[in-house]
């Protein structure tokens, strides 16, 4: 069986399929830490449901493709797992999200995961001739994969503009690179261009992210405390704040895409406003400290000796 999951007739297909499943399995579980926080706090905070709704759509789309094509068991297994995981994330989000966010999530879910997917299924099965169904559906999957590649561009531009890699975790980029390589090999060995081509883009963007990370990565700096001396004026607390590393909670990296190739997934992210607010809070705190320091500035007492 050419595309079988454990086909020994083509060990290369087996190895690439297994590797792709293992790496994608880990990527699907990446948001677990985020949702543990949501569960403990009983609140979604500033987290968005968009990545999980899009990831669910991606998984069901690739499952449908694997069923129409047949002999694509690696795609079936990992995307079936992905469907379950993403559905669990969405349910948990709906439980703890505020009413407005819950309604937006439900509307987006019905529009993308129900209406859009139903339209694709009906079109494929009833309007496209059977000999062309794989080509049509593969083209839809390919177009969707390329469309979501717009997401990494935003984070790449942000890193270049700010010269900061706070929003781009290196571990995720490494996993995505390995995943893209594994799924590219699977598409190559099974002669499936619809699996192979998206991974070229996934590999490229992952390598760019890793390159930017090492280019702009800076060693962790320690905050400089305001001090005084005989020959120096008090160091500005605001200036010291510029050397301080602002710790961001887990999940605050902005809209990073997980191009786990035949399964483009949008990664965990938190609204960037949250990070901006934290930075603003840090500056405000530094300004307050500066003001307090100036108010408590030690007086210089001149002692004149009588001659």
UniProtKB/Swiss-Prot annotation:
Residues 1-14, 69-74, 129-135, 190-194 are extracellular. The keyword Transmembrane helix applies. Disruption phenotype: Reduced starch content in pollen and male sterility. Enhanced resistance against bacterial blight mediated by X.oryzae pv. oryzae (Xoo) strain PXO99(A). Keywords: Cell membrane, Membrane, Plant defense, Repeat, Sugar transport, Transmembrane, Transmembrane helix, Transport. GO terms for biological process: carbohydrate transport; copper ion transport; defense response; sucrose transport. Mostly expressed in panicles and anthers. Also detected in leaves (leaf collar, leaf auricle, leaf ligule), roots, sheaths, culms and culm nodes. The chain crosses the membrane at residues 15-35, 48-68, 75-95, 108-128, 136-156, 169-189, 195-215. One of its GO terms (cellular component) is plasma membrane. It is found in: Cell membrane. Residues 17-100, 136-219 form the MtN3/slv domain. GO terms for molecular function: sucrose transmembrane transporter activity; sugar transmembrane transporter activity. Residues 36-47, 96-107, 157-168, 216-307 are cytoplasmic. Interacts with COPT1 and COPT2. Interacts with APX8. Belongs to the SWEET sugar transporter family. PANTHER family: BIDIRECTIONAL SUGAR TRANSPORTER SWEET11, RAG1-ACTIVATING PROTEIN 1. This is Bidirectional sugar transporter SWEET11. It comes from Oryza sativa subsp. japonica.
């Amino acid at each position: 069986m050419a595309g079988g999951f454990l086909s020994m007739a083509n060990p290369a297909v087996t190895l690439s399929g297994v590797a792709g499943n293992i790496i994608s399995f880990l990527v699907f579980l990446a948001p677990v830490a985020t949702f543990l926080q949501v569960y403990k706090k009983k609140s979604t905070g500033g987290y968005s449901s968009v990545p999980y709704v899009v990831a669910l759509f991606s998984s069901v789309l690739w499952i449908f493709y694997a069923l129409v094509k047949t002999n694509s068991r690696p795609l079936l297994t990992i995307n079936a797992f992905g469907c379950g995981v993403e559905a669990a994330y969405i349910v948990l989000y709906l439980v703890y999200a505020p009413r407005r966010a819950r309604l937006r999530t439900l509307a987006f879910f019905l529009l993308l995961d129900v209406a859009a997917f139903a339209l694709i299924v009906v079109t494929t099965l009833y309007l496209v001739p059977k000999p062309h169904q794989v080509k049509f559906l593969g083209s839809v999957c390919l177009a969707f994969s390329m469309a979501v590649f717009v997401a990494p561009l935003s984070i790449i531009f942000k890193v270049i503009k700010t010269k900061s890699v706070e929003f781009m975790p290196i571990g995720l980029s490494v996993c995505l690179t390995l995943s893209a390589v594994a799924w590219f090999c699977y598409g190559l060995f099974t002669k499936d261009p619809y699996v192979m081509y998206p991974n070229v883009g996934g590999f490229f963007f992952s390598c760019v992210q890793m390159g930017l990370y090492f280019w702009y990565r800076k060693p962790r700096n320690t905050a400089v405390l305001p001090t005084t001396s005989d020959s120096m004026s008090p160091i500005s607390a605001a200036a010291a704040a510029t050397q301080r590393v602002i710790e961001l909670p887990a999940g605050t990296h902005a809209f990073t895409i997980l191009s786990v190739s035949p399964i483009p997934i949008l990664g965990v992210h938190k609204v960037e406003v949250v990070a901006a607010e934290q930075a603003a809070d840090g500056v405000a705190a530094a300004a307050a400290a500066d003001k307090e320091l100036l108010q408590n500035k030690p007086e210089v007492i001149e002692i004149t000796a009588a001659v």
